């Protein structure tokens, strides 16, 4: 199955992020499937989001870490693709359409991520001027930053996503290295 907005769910893990999540949600296409995992056991964000966006599924749970919360969202998602994003992410211009177009031509990936203006890879750093001066569709890397990771669930037949032994930080590196 190919990537489309109909076959994509956005997973947003928060921890008392009510001050930033609304801008994130506004940057997503209308009628997007969205699952928010609130990791603080605070019902206020759930109540506020459900009032403003009744179509969004909001789960409030104990904080067992970022990887665990992402796994909860991915497993609840009923689409073939899960876009795990941080609550401070804002998609600009045609970023999502570019990702969908790329995916249509290159569907043999487990994880796909947009490039940021300051992305760090092990022993490798890409700067804005390097991005602007190079004409490339993609870079194959060992790991991507966890701020925005498109997960092709069809490549995870074992349903093993993030290692929940990583509470916070490096869970994205571990996942990428296991799927390389």
Which residues does each predicted region cover?
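Short, flexible, basic/aromatic active-site loop/helix in glycosyltransferases
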Residues: 124-148
